[in-house]
Amino acid sequence: IDFVGQMHRAGVPLLAGTDEMAGFTLQRELELYVQAGISPAEVLKIATWNGAKYSGVLTDRGSIEVGKLADLALVEGDPTTDITALRRMAIVVTQGRSIDPSRVFTELGIRPFVTTAPHWETSLQ
């Protein structure tokens, strides 16, 4: 963990990503970046903007802007100040559809080790 913090302070670009199941281990990786001394807001940039930049797709991904593609995760809390808020997903929006994370877990037979946020009334129409 200390080495990651040292690399970040030295200006080495960091990318977030794992070889495991998407979501679960990535959340933990981002928490470890915060433990390494990187602010939660900067960790979110590493997980989004940096990935798009170094994958060569920054023109249409990596940030929320008009004309860019985006999948969104709405969480309970503010992950720019508390990275563990990423574990409290309320709604995931992908390809213009909203998905309740708890239903995905149930349908896949997964018992989540993350907490879903209280259900909000939502409508994307």
For each feature predicted by the language model, list its residue ranges.
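Residues that scaffold the ATP/ADP-binding catalytic core of kinase and kinase-like folds
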Residues: 54, 83, 101
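Short amphipathic alpha-helical segments
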Residues: 28-29, 85-87, 105
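Short, Lys/Arg- and Gly-enriched loop/turn segments at beta-strand edges
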Residues: 79-85
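Structured helix-beta-strand junction loops
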Residues: 10-11, 86-89
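Short, surface-exposed secondary-structure edge patches
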Residues: 61-64, 83, 90
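Extracellular/periplasmic ectodomains of large secreted or surface enzymes and adhesion receptors
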Residues: 5-8, 91, 95-125
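His/Asp/Glu-enriched, well-ordered alpha-helical/loop segment
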Residues: 1-78, 98
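His/acidic/aromatic-lined binding-pocket segments of jelly-roll/cupin-type domains
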Residues: 72-73, 90-92
